[in-house]
């Protein structure tokens, strides 16, 4: 009985330590979530304005005869190349996951839904080019034999434009060199602190579908949209302005996806750690009850034995 009591006591102490760790991790994740949400609200205003300008100019450019394929000898990607459709031989998959675990179903949801997308669109190991942001996705696709052409690990808790520029530069360069002919971005979209939803967004080539998805994402910032109607005269030219703004738009698409995914990651981590803390608390209560009952039984047994001994002596 003494050993049993010691075992239960040991489990109680161990569970209390786990409870302290998960509670601390929950507070850290909640703090990160609050911090990144401030950046998200600022980004939405910026993204809405950029999208409004680019949407007007690019849609006109898409309908014009000048939207041909860029010169393949150029080392930089042009506006026409970003907008022009071409035969699809390879499909790029930019998959955003976390670098670590302890985030609930966050990673498994992204990977499962991405695999479903691949099956639906007939994308397999032969024609898929994976670009992984986050170690979990990179390791998963390497293990499953897919071509992981690029991976970026260690994204900040609050991602910066500097990080995104490096990713966008690599992605557009690969697109320019025809490593893939279209690019989709896959990530978890933050809905609220308790839930998130999977997103699959076509990034390249930039099309009307891209603008429609971007407009939907930036609904909350619609009051700050810039009205760029035909009454505005563009200087020096629409092409020059589009050349300057379109790369920023591509950056904002990727930055928005990573920011959204990170927000969902912190929310998922906070929720998972809260559930773990609650479960640990429940287990501690059950173990305390078990310990007290075992201790009470041991005391009762000892009293019974003492009483029996006294009676025997009489």
Curated annotation (Swiss-Prot):
Cysteine pairs bridged by disulfides in the record: none
GO biological process terms, semicolon-separated: proton motive force-driven plasma membrane ATP synthesis
Keyword Calcium part of the UniProt annotation: no
A GO CC term attached to the entry: plasma membrane
Subunit structure as annotated in this protein's UniProt entry: F-type ATPases have 2 components, CF(1) - the catalytic core - and CF(0) - the membrane proton channel. CF(1) has five subunits: alpha(3), beta(3), gamma(1), delta(1), epsilon(1). CF(0) has three main subunits: a, b and c.
Family assignment from sequence similarity: Belongs to the ATPase gamma chain family.
HAMAP family hit by this protein: ATP_synth_gamma_bact
Name the record gives this protein: ATP synthase gamma chain
Native source organism of the sequence: Lactiplantibacillus plantarum (strain ATCC BAA-793 / NCIMB 8826 / WCFS1) (Lactobacillus plantarum)
Gene this chain is encoded by: atpG
